[in-house]
Amino acid sequence: MEFKHISVLLEETIDSLNIKEDGVYVDCTLGGGGHSKEILKKLSHKGKLIGIDQDTSAIKAAKEKLKDYENIIYVHNNFYNIDSILEELDIDKVDGIIMDLGVSSYQLDEASRGFSYMKDAPLDMRMNREENFSAYNVVNSYEEEELFKILKNYGEEKFSRKIARFIVEKRTENPIETTGELVEIIRKAIPAKFQREGHPAKRTFQAIRIEVNKELQILNKAIEDSVNRLNKDGRLSIITFHSLEDRIVKVKFKELEKPCTCPPSFPICVCGKEPQIKIITKKPIEPSKEEKEINSRSRSAKLRVCRKI
């Protein structure tokens, strides 16, 4: 299957990086190479781009899309490791970093990946298929209380307790092996009148995917390490697709902009914690009405940008 992914907020993200033609940039989530291609167009032969992705299918697709460009380095890894990746490449500082935290259209559309609740497939949801831990492990081995917390905290699912109980009850008969089986369990757990508000499995699938790929744990550290690797005036641009991610980015940016922990009554700062960034987007940038109509998957996207000081 061809790797397809429509880059969200493409123009806005590229503009936010304030690209210098001889700069060094990092695309932490290479995907199909959409954002990377626009960055490369603006770089001279002295500029450089590092493209990171934990999905080998994404890297293969990007290499084909970007075959005309020589100043890109491909890295099969998780952007959680951005610090060690740049260390290994002997790169100290960079001028801009982008993170697009969405699941690619390819990953959603390829049934075998197990991300989609619309297609029956083995329970998988691994971004990195070289990892052993998958959605199957979460669904079939987690205790009921663990499942409840994941569905509640990562999926913001109001019926998380009931869904967790139904999953545990069902798997005592036989292991739950496919997305179709899981969807049926969720349908039985959620009252019919609440199933009119979008697909009933959406929040549960989101929660399990986040748990499988440790997405929220990765994000905090990745933001801190990225800011540390930016040159002065370098930009960090992050696209999120649900409120949990957006909240983490918003809070972390605020912490880095105003890190002082002194009591408000202190006349001067004595904690020694200095601001590292300036937030550029006081409110997140969202897709235009036109983009939302063209690409329905962009509807929940939000772009937040900061500048290293």
Swiss-Prot record:
Single GO BP term: rRNA base methylation
Amino acids binding S-adenosyl-L-methionine: G33, G34, H35, D53, F79, D100, Q107
UniProt key word Nuclease: no
Subcellular location, record wording: Cytoplasm
EC number(s) given by UniProt: 2.1.1.199
A GO MF label: rRNA (cytosine-N4-)-methyltransferase activity
Reactions it catalyzes: cytidine(1402) in 16S rRNA + S-adenosyl-L-methionine = N(4)-methylcytidine(1402) in 16S rRNA + S-adenosyl-L-homocysteine + H(+)
Paired cysteines (S-S): none
Record's keyword terms, sorted: Cytoplasm, Methyltransferase, rRNA processing, S-adenosyl-L-methionine, Transferase
Pfam families attached to this UniProt entry: Methyltransf_5
GO cellular component: cytoplasm
Family classification: Belongs to the methyltransferase superfamily. RsmH family.
Task of the protein: Specifically methylates the N4 position of cytidine in position 1402 (C1402) of 16S rRNA.
Protein known as: Ribosomal RNA small subunit methyltransferase H
Protein's organism: Clostridium botulinum (strain Langeland / NCTC 10281 / Type F)
